[in-house]
Protein backbone atom coordinates (compact mmCIF):
# COMPACT_ATOMS: atom_id res chain seq x y z
CA UNK A 1 0.00 0.00 0.00
CA UNK A 2 2.79 2.37 0.90
CA UNK A 3 4.53 1.83 -2.46
CA UNK A 4 1.25 2.29 -4.35
CA UNK A 5 0.59 5.56 -2.53
CA UNK A 6 4.16 6.74 -3.14
CA UNK A 7 3.98 5.98 -6.87
CA UNK A 8 0.32 7.02 -7.20
CA UNK A 9 -0.56 3.72 -8.88
CA UNK A 10 -3.74 1.66 -8.78
CA UNK A 11 -2.89 -1.62 -7.06
CA UNK A 12 -5.28 -4.47 -6.32
CA UNK A 13 -4.77 -6.44 -3.14
CA UNK A 14 -5.39 -10.17 -3.49
CA UNK A 15 -5.71 -12.14 -0.26
CA UNK A 16 -6.02 -15.84 0.46
CA UNK A 17 -6.53 -17.97 3.54
CA UNK A 18 -4.11 -20.72 4.58
CA UNK A 19 -6.96 -23.18 4.17
CA UNK A 20 -7.43 -22.05 0.56
CA UNK A 21 -3.73 -22.56 -0.04
CA UNK A 22 -3.83 -26.07 1.39
CA UNK A 23 -6.82 -26.96 -0.79
CA UNK A 24 -4.72 -26.15 -3.88
CA UNK A 25 -1.50 -27.97 -2.92
CA UNK A 26 -2.25 -30.72 -5.43
CA UNK A 27 -2.76 -28.15 -8.19
CA UNK A 28 0.43 -26.31 -7.27
CA UNK A 29 2.62 -29.41 -7.20
CA UNK A 30 1.05 -30.63 -10.44
CA UNK A 31 1.91 -27.31 -12.10
CA UNK A 32 5.43 -27.21 -10.66
CA UNK A 33 6.43 -30.83 -11.22
CA UNK A 34 8.48 -30.31 -8.06
CA UNK A 35 8.41 -31.36 -4.41
CA UNK A 36 10.94 -28.82 -3.13
CA UNK A 37 9.57 -27.40 0.12
CA UNK A 38 10.58 -23.76 -0.30
CA UNK A 39 9.34 -23.76 -3.89
CA UNK A 40 5.94 -25.24 -2.99
CA UNK A 41 5.48 -22.82 -0.10
CA UNK A 42 6.28 -19.76 -2.21
CA UNK A 43 4.44 -21.02 -5.28
CA UNK A 44 1.07 -21.44 -3.57
CA UNK A 45 0.34 -17.71 -3.09
CA UNK A 46 1.76 -16.94 -6.54
CA UNK A 47 -0.39 -19.68 -8.13
CA UNK A 48 -3.48 -18.22 -6.45
CA UNK A 49 -2.51 -14.69 -7.53
CA UNK A 50 -2.13 -15.80 -11.15
CA UNK A 51 -5.50 -17.54 -10.92
CA UNK A 52 -7.06 -14.27 -9.75
CA UNK A 53 -5.41 -12.29 -12.56
CA UNK A 54 -6.72 -14.76 -15.14
CA UNK A 55 -10.27 -14.75 -13.78
CA UNK A 56 -10.71 -11.08 -12.93
CA UNK A 57 -8.59 -9.06 -15.37
CA UNK A 58 -7.75 -8.83 -19.05
CA UNK A 59 -4.00 -8.86 -18.29
CA UNK A 60 -2.02 -11.56 -20.01
CA UNK A 61 1.53 -10.29 -19.45
CA UNK A 62 2.84 -9.99 -15.91
CA UNK A 63 6.15 -8.68 -14.59
CA UNK A 64 7.92 -10.51 -11.80
CA UNK A 65 11.12 -9.85 -9.86
CA UNK A 66 12.90 -13.21 -9.84
CA UNK A 67 16.64 -13.30 -10.43
CA UNK A 68 18.14 -10.42 -8.49
CA UNK A 69 18.91 -12.53 -5.42
CA UNK A 70 20.72 -15.11 -7.52
CA UNK A 71 22.63 -12.53 -9.56
CA UNK A 72 23.60 -10.22 -6.70
CA UNK A 73 23.83 -12.67 -3.80
CA UNK A 74 20.76 -11.32 -2.05
CA UNK A 75 19.80 -14.29 0.10
CA UNK A 76 20.46 -13.73 3.79
CA UNK A 77 22.69 -16.77 4.14
CA UNK A 78 25.17 -15.12 1.77
CA UNK A 79 26.25 -13.06 4.80
CA UNK A 80 27.93 -16.24 6.04
CA UNK A 81 30.32 -16.44 3.07
CA UNK A 82 33.85 -16.52 4.54
CA UNK A 83 35.44 -14.83 1.52
CA UNK A 84 34.68 -13.39 -1.90
CA UNK A 85 35.53 -16.64 -3.70
CA UNK A 86 32.94 -18.60 -1.69
CA UNK A 87 30.41 -15.79 -2.20
CA UNK A 88 30.87 -15.76 -5.98
CA UNK A 89 30.86 -19.56 -6.18
CA UNK A 90 27.50 -19.84 -4.40
CA UNK A 91 26.25 -16.84 -6.39
CA UNK A 92 26.92 -18.64 -9.68
CA UNK A 93 25.57 -21.96 -8.39
CA UNK A 94 22.26 -20.38 -7.46
CA UNK A 95 22.02 -18.71 -10.85
CA UNK A 96 22.66 -22.02 -12.63
CA UNK A 97 19.93 -23.72 -10.56
CA UNK A 98 17.30 -20.97 -10.84
CA UNK A 99 15.30 -23.01 -13.37
CA UNK A 100 14.65 -25.59 -10.64
CA UNK A 101 13.51 -23.17 -7.97
CA UNK A 102 12.39 -19.51 -8.26
CA UNK A 103 12.47 -19.51 -12.04
CA UNK A 104 10.40 -22.69 -12.09
CA UNK A 105 7.90 -21.21 -9.64
CA UNK A 106 7.36 -18.05 -11.62
CA UNK A 107 7.16 -19.78 -15.01
CA UNK A 108 4.84 -22.61 -13.96
CA UNK A 109 2.48 -20.52 -11.82
CA UNK A 110 1.94 -18.05 -14.66
CA UNK A 111 1.77 -20.74 -17.34
CA UNK A 112 -0.80 -22.76 -15.39
CA UNK A 113 -3.24 -19.91 -15.94
CA UNK A 114 -2.31 -18.97 -19.49
CA UNK A 115 -0.28 -15.90 -18.51
CA UNK A 116 3.01 -14.80 -20.07
CA UNK A 117 5.75 -13.93 -17.61
CA UNK A 118 8.28 -11.12 -18.09
CA UNK A 119 11.30 -11.26 -15.76
CA UNK A 120 13.43 -8.09 -16.23
CA UNK A 121 16.19 -9.11 -13.79
CA UNK A 122 16.90 -12.19 -15.90
CA UNK A 123 17.43 -10.18 -19.07
CA UNK A 124 20.76 -11.24 -20.57
CA UNK A 125 22.07 -7.67 -20.82
CA UNK A 126 21.22 -7.04 -17.16
CA UNK A 127 22.91 -10.26 -16.08
CA UNK A 128 26.01 -9.45 -18.13
CA UNK A 129 26.15 -5.95 -16.64
CA UNK A 130 25.91 -7.35 -13.11
CA UNK A 131 28.69 -9.82 -13.82
CA UNK A 132 31.03 -6.91 -14.61
CA UNK A 133 30.51 -5.37 -11.16
CA UNK A 134 33.46 -5.76 -8.82
CA UNK A 135 32.48 -8.82 -6.80
CA UNK A 136 33.67 -7.19 -3.57
CA UNK A 137 30.91 -4.60 -3.98
CA UNK A 138 28.28 -7.35 -3.75
CA UNK A 139 29.52 -8.39 -0.30
CA UNK A 140 27.86 -5.95 2.07
CA UNK A 141 25.98 -6.04 5.39
CA UNK A 142 22.99 -4.83 3.36
CA UNK A 143 22.09 -7.39 0.73
CA UNK A 144 21.81 -6.17 -2.89
CA UNK A 145 23.10 -2.71 -2.00
CA UNK A 146 24.00 -2.00 -5.65
CA UNK A 147 20.41 -2.61 -6.76
CA UNK A 148 18.92 -0.64 -3.88
CA UNK A 149 21.10 2.36 -4.72
CA UNK A 150 19.90 2.22 -8.34
CA UNK A 151 16.27 2.52 -7.18
CA UNK A 152 16.86 5.42 -4.77
CA UNK A 153 14.01 7.89 -5.24
CA UNK A 154 11.78 5.38 -7.02
CA UNK A 155 10.59 3.67 -3.82
CA UNK A 156 9.93 4.85 -0.25
CA UNK A 157 13.26 4.94 1.60
CA UNK A 158 12.22 2.58 4.41
CA UNK A 159 10.84 0.03 1.92
CA UNK A 160 13.91 0.24 -0.29
CA UNK A 161 16.37 -0.34 2.55
CA UNK A 162 14.50 -2.85 4.72
CA UNK A 163 15.85 -6.37 5.20
CA UNK A 164 14.87 -8.93 2.60
CA UNK A 165 11.87 -11.20 3.26
CA UNK A 166 11.50 -14.57 1.57
CA UNK A 167 8.34 -14.78 -0.54
CA UNK A 168 6.60 -17.42 1.57
CA UNK A 169 7.47 -15.41 4.71
CA UNK A 170 6.43 -12.09 3.20
CA UNK A 171 2.85 -13.26 2.57
CA UNK A 172 2.54 -14.03 6.29
CA UNK A 173 3.96 -16.56 8.73
CA UNK A 174 0.42 -17.84 9.23
CA UNK A 175 0.63 -19.61 5.85
CA UNK A 176 3.83 -21.49 6.67
CA UNK A 177 2.69 -22.36 10.20
CA UNK A 178 -0.65 -23.68 8.97
CA UNK A 179 0.79 -25.87 6.23
CA UNK A 180 3.29 -27.32 8.73
CA UNK A 181 0.44 -28.21 11.10
CA UNK A 182 -1.52 -29.70 8.20
CA UNK A 183 1.44 -31.91 7.30
CA UNK A 184 1.77 -33.05 10.92
CA UNK A 185 -1.88 -34.13 10.87
CA UNK A 186 -1.72 -35.81 7.44
CA UNK A 187 1.57 -37.69 7.80
CA UNK A 188 1.87 -39.97 10.84
CA UNK A 189 5.17 -41.49 11.95
CA UNK A 190 4.59 -44.74 10.05
CA UNK A 191 3.83 -42.90 6.80
CA UNK A 192 6.83 -40.63 7.31
CA UNK A 193 9.18 -43.58 7.73
CA UNK A 194 7.73 -45.27 4.63
CA UNK A 195 8.24 -42.16 2.51
CA UNK A 196 11.81 -41.80 3.78
CA UNK A 197 12.47 -45.46 2.98
CA UNK A 198 11.02 -45.16 -0.53
CA UNK A 199 13.23 -42.12 -1.22
CA UNK A 200 16.19 -44.54 -1.42
CA UNK A 201 18.60 -41.96 -0.05
CA UNK A 202 17.77 -39.29 -2.66
CA UNK A 203 16.64 -35.90 -1.31
CA UNK A 204 15.56 -37.61 1.90
CA UNK A 205 12.60 -35.84 3.57
CA UNK A 206 13.63 -34.45 6.95
CA UNK A 207 10.22 -33.12 8.03
CA UNK A 208 6.62 -34.20 7.65
CA UNK A 209 6.01 -31.20 5.41
CA UNK A 210 8.74 -32.40 3.04
CA UNK A 211 7.27 -35.91 3.19
CA UNK A 212 3.80 -34.56 2.35
CA UNK A 213 5.02 -32.78 -0.78
CA UNK A 214 7.03 -35.83 -1.82
CA UNK A 215 3.99 -38.10 -1.48
CA UNK A 216 1.79 -35.73 -3.51
CA UNK A 217 4.48 -35.56 -6.19
CA UNK A 218 4.68 -39.37 -6.34
CA UNK A 219 0.90 -39.66 -6.81
CA UNK A 220 1.12 -37.51 -9.92
CA UNK A 221 4.53 -38.29 -11.38
CA UNK A 222 5.75 -41.47 -9.71
CA UNK A 223 8.94 -42.17 -7.80
CA UNK A 224 10.96 -42.59 -10.99
CA UNK A 225 10.95 -38.81 -11.50
CA UNK A 226 12.51 -37.81 -8.16
CA UNK A 227 15.65 -36.82 -10.07
CA UNK A 228 13.84 -33.86 -11.69
CA UNK A 229 14.90 -31.92 -8.57
CA UNK A 230 18.65 -32.02 -7.96
CA UNK A 231 18.37 -30.90 -4.33
CA UNK A 232 15.90 -29.70 -1.72
CA UNK A 233 16.41 -26.10 -0.72
Describe the function of each predicted region.
Residues 180-192:
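Short glycine/proline-rich, acidic loop/turn segments that cap or connect secondary-structure elements
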Residues 15, 156-165:
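Conserved S-adenosyl-L-methionine
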Residues 1-155, 170-180, 195, 200-206, ...:
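ATP-dependent adenylate-handling active sites, centered on carboxylate activation for C-N bond formation
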Amino acid sequence: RKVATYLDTDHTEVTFTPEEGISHLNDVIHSLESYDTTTVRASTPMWLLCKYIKQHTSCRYIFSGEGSDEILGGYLYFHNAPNVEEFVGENMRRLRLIHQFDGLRADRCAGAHGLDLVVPFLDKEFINACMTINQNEKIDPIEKRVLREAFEGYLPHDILWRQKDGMSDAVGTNWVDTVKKYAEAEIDSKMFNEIVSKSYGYNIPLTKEEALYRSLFWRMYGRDNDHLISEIW
